[in-house]
């Protein structure tokens, strides 16, 4: 691995949308295997370090869950005191990832992410750029508008945007060079408008800013399987991830 990569997992959500009562990263898939274990298996071979951002109430349980990896130095943990959104979680943890060349951001509920996608993203990434795996979706929840090497816009259903059938959606993975990244986030915050529904300054609209204003070229890694975009937001999503794992057909196998 020519570049030093730090994977960062924002996992400070409370799991309220799913009604689980625990952070989604700690939900059991089967036989003691949690979402965390699946993510770690996929990320560790392609990253030098994994950093996880948790909520105050999630810190102790997660440290227990990942005790072995933390003790080995392969994993570190920080706390997002207030749920201000993914951007706040990622950049609040900047001291942990800034020593590395590249940050590989992965949402903490992406149980269906394949090892092949992680490998291809890291291989395609260039330090100064922005690399995002995208997949066409029949009914996307988030849609990316791309023009050549530029990311024009990210539409978000959660903020009232209309996403078009067949549009490109992410799989919860974003690869960015760390040099100057926190400075660009600070600049972005000066004029960034809060989401019309959530009231949060979201991370996803920061990506078109990086592409168009900061001049970071976009590399799209095509993904064929739309199931990789399926996080765990509902009981149906959780059932899907569990059934795929038990069949041995979750992306990349066990």
Indicate where each model-derived feature is located.
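Hydrophobic packing residues within well-ordered alpha-helices of enzyme cores
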Residues: 18, 61-66, 121, 185, ...
């Amino acid at each position: 691995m020519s570049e030093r990569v730090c994977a960062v997992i924002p996992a400070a959500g409370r799991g309220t949308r799913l009604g689980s009562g625990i952070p989604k990263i700690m939900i059991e898939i089967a036989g003691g295997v949690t979402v965390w274990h699946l993510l770690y298996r996929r990320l560790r071979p392609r990253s030098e370090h994994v950093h996880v951002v948790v909520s105050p109430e999630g810190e102790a349980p997660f440290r227990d869950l990942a005790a072995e990896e933390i003790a080995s130095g392969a994993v570190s943990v920080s706390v997002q005191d207030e749920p201000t959104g993914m951007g706040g979680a990622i950049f609040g943890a900047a001291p942990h990832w800034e020593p590395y060349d590249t940050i590989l951001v992965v949402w903490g509920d992406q149980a269906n992410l394949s090892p092949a996608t992680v490998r291809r993203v890291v291989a395609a990434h260039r330090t100064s750029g922005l690399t995002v795996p995208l997949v066409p979706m029949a009914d996307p929840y988030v849609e990316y508008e791309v023009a050549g090497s530029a990311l024009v816009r990210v539409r978000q259903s959660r903020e009232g945007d209309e996403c078009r059938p067949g549009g490109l959606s992410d799989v919860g993975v974003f690869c960015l060079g760390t040099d100057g990244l926190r400075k660009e986030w600070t600049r972005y915050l000066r004029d960034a408008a809060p989401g019309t529904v959530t009231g949060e300054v979201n991370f996803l609209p920061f990506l078109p800013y990086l592409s168009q204003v900061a001049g970071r070229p976009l590399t799209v890694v095509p993904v064929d399987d739309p199931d990789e975009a399926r996080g765990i937001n509902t009981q149906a999503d959780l059932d899907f991830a569990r059934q795929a794992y038990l069949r041995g057909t979750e992306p990349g196998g066990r």
